[in-house]
Swiss-Prot record:
Belongs to the dihydroorotate dehydrogenase family. Type 2 subfamily. The active site is at S174 (nucleophile). Its cofactor is FMN. Keywords: Cell membrane, Flavoprotein, FMN, Membrane, Oxidoreductase, Pyrimidine biosynthesis. GO terms for molecular function: dihydroorotate dehydrogenase (quinone) activity. Binds 1 FMN per subunit. One of its GO terms (biological process) is 'de novo' UMP biosynthetic process. Its EC number is 1.3.5.2. The gene is pyrD. This is Dihydroorotate dehydrogenase (quinone).
Amino acid sequence: MYSLARELLFKLSPETSHELSIDLIGAGGRLGLNGLLTKAPASLPTSVMGLQFANPVGLAAGLDKNGDAIDGFAQLGFGFVEIGTVTPRPQPGNPKPRLFRLPQAEAVINRMGFNNLGVDHLLERVKAAKYQGVLGINIGKNFDTPVERAVDDYLTCLDKVYAHASYVTVNVSSPNTPGLRSLQFGDSLKELLEALRRRQEDLTQEHGKRVPLAIKIAPDMSDEETALVASALLGADMDAVIATNTTLSREGVEGLAHADEAGGLSGSPVRDKSTHIVKVLAGELGGRLPIIAVGGITEGRHAAEKIAAGASLVQIYSGFIYKGPALIREAVDAIAALRK
């Protein structure tokens, strides 16, 4: 059934297809229909960050930037849903076209640029949703906020989403916001993490609950850089790391249509690179910080490979575009088989 829907959607431009898909999934969620469209995955309860997940397979940030289809995605069987990236103020993102399919490689290139309707709009959508499961909210900085003031944007978003999120992801790894990835390293990372940690403590007192903080990192790092990031996360007492965002590499898509477009590459070509980062992180963290793995999961076994590499949870995005809701069940089944 999804193969037919995909064939029709792929006749549209990628961004039009994306918007239509969100509308349809959102409408199906409001009507309670999405659960009828696919066989539900097996129950596989998983505890991470002090949270209880129905299963360890989640929706990665970026598909539902504004929280328009939270109930719809949950009904498809995801064990958790992450929305965003959201910024303090609405922003249009980069000029179109900015989203490209590379179907021969089961890949996507995007240079969206954190297009979103702002954190206040997203919170209205969160409040309207009926979903009671684990909800992650991914936060970023506005395009026109200088990098040296990026901390202010993250704290603004954290203040606003804290009471409504199960966990909050801090996106310092999108390649489509100039200067953003510099926040992953050195004093910039240390200062950001310390500010977030202090604010988390204040908000815990204010709201009477501790909301975990996860940091989302890029795949384009050496083992030494990854080790330094791991050390910084441990030093700041972060709650999780999400590995990884999209890559600037074009390995695996050379010569394909759109391969030379600027932006981050996701899907199958980033799989090995992302899994390697997970392995390095796992070795450095030694179980002291959970890893949420994302990048290139297009078959169930790819999810199991990431768990075997050291992840506690996985997320999918591009694989969902190419394989549809059945991939969720396949990933849950593969992880369940690994645990036996």
